């Protein structure tokens, strides 16, 4: 987005980098995440109000450490280093960083030594979140300590320039003063104004789409999820009948979702939607496959194949619309460091390079919560916009083991009961994500006087604000009892229900 009222975040591979950006956006200030090794010349020629250096998994004293050009600190814009970012500042200003004998992971008490600028309107003592194995042993030249914990220097600032460092993470909710501190940096130190508004984004996006597309046609893969649906409505608002949406019914969606939702969309927003019934093709391709990564790749490749078959039939199509959002963009350019792939993202790996379309991604600057607010502003139903996330591969990653038509039907029915009961108890909007998993495990049961031998289903519900960490939902026992009773009595083929009480980490939210 073209604006001078923005913050640039240089990413050194921290798991919390996206959180920093979200917290800045929450302050209604636009920000972008760039790789740490972005050319200094590009940074120099970019209009901005401030720079934030993220945390990261490396150590500044290692041979292959992620470092930046020291000239960055001569750009006359405020700089805030967080965790590893503070250690870089220290290292490049002749400070000493070394491995701590007593490492800090978790809650820590912060004691502020200087309540000016960065710590204005913040209590002298507060709870913060630490996550570091290294610490500053010797202060960098021309810097002073402005906060400490029991074990280490927790914050520093340059005596003349607007350069600051924090050893803790202000972006995580565990740091109670975090948002006030970021507000102090963004508004008081950098001089930003709260001008990042969804209504202004929509207006600018519509103008950009019209200018870019002209009289060409656009085709969009519409899944029925929030991102692609908001993208469709935004594109349609800009170019109307020039947009054609293609819905590929994989047969792996929730009961009463997908096409049912899109028919309402079609009616309300006058969208042109082509429906492709491809259930049999997906079942055939997935027959005998049990490995979750194989499932994801098969589904992704087949989806693209079917979509392409239909897209090339449409006249004068020059553009392919995608509901790419900012976390996808960040992931594509982020610094991975030593971290391993947990599971492949269902949006990655995608389109053939020889596809005869140009990409148009009107949501690529937005985080998920901003996409939802955009949907609301465009008139999309609140219940739809705020529905729980659903994985791209659909129920295929909620059926552990081989996928069959019978298992899909069982899972759809059980899942619908759980969702219905959450709505009935007014709890659906109180949890972040809820679903049922079908296990390849059968057990003996008794229904009336008859012995049964049925599948085991797992009920899963989590609470989270960012989906990077999550706690299992403390749902009322009475609700769980009702859900269990309804599933085993109404879904013939499932005779045992368990409740997953694993948080993230160590688990992931989805099972596959």
Swiss-Prot record:
It catalyses: XMP + L-glutamine + ATP + H2O = GMP + L-glutamate + AMP + diphosphate + 2 H(+). The keyword Manganese does not apply. It comes from the Bacteria. GO terms for molecular function: ATP binding; GMP synthase activity. Residues 6-195 form the Glutamine amidotransferase type-1 domain. Transmembrane segments: none annotated. The active site is at 83 (nucleophile), 169, 171. The keyword Transferase does not apply. It is an enzyme of class 6 (ligase). ATP binds at residues 223-229. It holds the Pfam family GATase. One of its GO terms (cellular component) is cytosol. Catalyzes the synthesis of GMP from XMP. Homodimer. PANTHER family: GMP SYNTHASE [GLUTAMINE-HYDROLYZING], GMP SYNTHASE-RELATED. This is GMP synthase [glutamine-hydrolyzing]. It comes from Spiroplasma kunkelii.
